[in-house]
From Swiss-Prot:
The lineage of its organism: Bacteria, Pseudomonadati, Pseudomonadota, Betaproteobacteria, Burkholderiales. One of its GO terms (molecular function) is zinc ion binding. The keyword Transport does not apply. It comes from Cupriavidus necator (strain ATCC 17699 / DSM 428 / KCTC 22496 / NCIMB 10442 / H16 / Stanier 337). It is found in: Cytoplasm. Disulfide bonds: none annotated. This is Endoribonuclease YbeY.
Length: 198
C-alpha cells in the first residue's frame, strides 16, 4: 500500500493527487490545485457535467428506472473532472449485441462503459450502458433494492469512464473501496456486502 499526501503552500488552495494506471507497466500522477471554500462560505466549484440520458428501443417507460435527478446525483458523486457522459438504458437484445460486438462475449451484462478519452489530458467522455433486465434480475437475486443497484452500477461506470479498472486485484480493491465510500455517502449499503457481481 502506498499513501500519498498533497499539501498546497497557499492556504486558499487545496492540493490533489490523482494516480491511475496507464498501461500494464506504468502509472500517471497528476497534481492539481483547487480553491478552498471562500470567506463567504461558497464551496469550490464541482466538476462540470454534460449528461444525456437515453432509453433504448426496448425500454420505453420501464418500471423501476431511476429519475434523472437521482442519476445526476449518482454521476456527480463519482466524478473527479469535467465530463460529458451518456447513460443509456437498454433491453437484453441491445445489451447482448453491444457486449458481443465490443467485448466478444455473447450475453447481456449489467453495465458496459465506453470511455473515449485517449489520454488523461482529454476531457472525460463516455457512454455508460445499463441492461435493465440484467440489473433487475441481479437486484432481485442479491436481495438489493433496485435503486441501490442502479446507483452502484452507474457509479461503477463513471469510475471506468475516468480510467479506473479492476483487472488486477489491487485495482479492484481500490475501485471497490471508492464505490463503497461513495454509495455509503449517498445513503446506500455497501454494494459488495455478500456479493461481488460487477
Amino acid at each position: 500500500m502506498v499513501a500519498l499526501l498533497a499539501e498546497h503552500t497557499d492556504t486558499n488552495q487545496q492540493a490533489g493527487l490523482l494516480v491511475r494506471p496507464d498501461n500494464h507497466d506504468s502509472l500517471s500522477v497528476a497534481v492539481t490545485a483547487t480553491p478552498v471554500v471562500t470567506t463567504t462560505g461558497t464551496p469550490a466549484t464541482p466538476p462540470g457535467l454534460e449528461l444525456e440520458i437515453q432509453n433504448g428501443d426496448g425500454v420505453g417507460k420501464r418500471a423501476g428506472l431511476p429519475p434523472r435527478r437521482k442519476i445526476e446525483t449518482w454521476v456527480k458523486s463519482a466524478l473527479y473532472a469535467d465530463a460529458a457522459l451518456t447513460i443509456r438504458f437498454v433491453d437484453e437484445e441491445e445489451g447482448r449485441t453491444l457486449n458481443r460486438t465490443y467485448r466478444g462475449k455473447d450475453y447481456a451484462t449489467n453495465v458496459l462503459t465506453f470511455a473515449y478519452a485517449e489520454n488523461e489530458e482529454d476531457p472525460v467522455t463516455g457512454d455508460i450502458v445499463l441492461c435493465c433486465p440484467v440489473v433487475e434480475t441481479e437486484a432481485r437475486e442479491q436481495r438489493k433494492p433496485l435503486e441501490a443497484h442502479y446507483a452502484h452500477l452507474i457509479v461503477h461506470g463513471v469510475l471506468h469512464a475516468q480510467g479506473y479498472e479492476h483487472e488486477e486485484d489491487a485495482e479492484a480493491e481500490e475501485m471497490e473501496a471508492i464505490e463503497t465510500e461513495t454509495l455509503q455517502a449517498l445513503g446506500y449499503a455497501d454494494p459488495y456486502q455478500g456479493d461481488r457481481t460487477v
